[in-house]
C-alpha cells in the first residue's frame, strides 16, 4: 500500500474506492474499522455482532462509494449511518430490536434523578453499569447517546448519521440522558439489594455454624 494513501484524506480514499482501487478500501478499513466496531459494540453489547457489522459496513462502502457526496456529510457520519442501519438489521434478524414506535418522542416532564447515581462504586463497576444502562435504552435513544456522548460526534454529524435534524438530536439526547440517569439509579438500587441479600445470607450461615460448633 502506498504511503500516499495512508496520508490522504477520507474523502479522497472514498473517491479512490469509487474508482476501483482496492488498496484505498484497505487504507480506509485500517483507519476507520475500530471506530465502526466500537459503535456497533456500544449499540449491541455483542462482540461477535460488532465484528459482523464492521465487515458489513466496509462491503457496503465498496459498493456505495460512488454515491458518497463530499461536503454533504463527513465520512465519519456516513460510516456511522451505514453502521447504524447494519446494527438494526442484525438485531432485527436476531429478534432483539425494540420497536421504534414503542417509545414515542416525548417533550413531557423528565424524571428527577440524583446528581451522581453511581455514588461510590469503583471505576470498573461504574463502566459495567453504564454499559448495561445504555443497552437498556430504546434504540432511538441509545443511538444518540452512543453517537454524541460515547463517540463524541458533533450534533451535525450525529444528525447526518441518524438522518434527522440537529434539533431532533438535541431534544432526543436531552431525554435520553434523563432516561439513562434514571436507569442507572434503578440498576444501583438492584445492586444494593443484591449485596444486602448476599450479606444477610452470609450472616445466617455464620450464625448457623456457630450454633453447631
Residue ranges and their predicted role:
Residues 63-70, 80-102, 123, 175, ...:
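Arg/Lys-rich amphipathic alpha helix in sigma70-family domain 2
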Residues 18-19, 42-46, 56-73, 93-95:
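Sigma70-family region 2
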Residues 38, 52-59, 73-85:
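Structural recognition of an alpha-helix C-terminal capping motif at a helix-to-coil junction
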Residues 2-4, 18-27, 37-56:
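Short, charged helix-capping/linker segments at alpha-helix termini
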Residues 1-15, 19, 23, 27-31, ...:
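Intrinsic, short, N-terminal disordered tails of RNA polymerase sigma-factor systems
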Residues 29-47, 64, 134, 186:
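Amphipathic, Lys/Arg- and hydrophobic-enriched alpha-helical face
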Residues 54, 173, 180, 184:
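DNA major-groove recognition helix of helix-turn-helix
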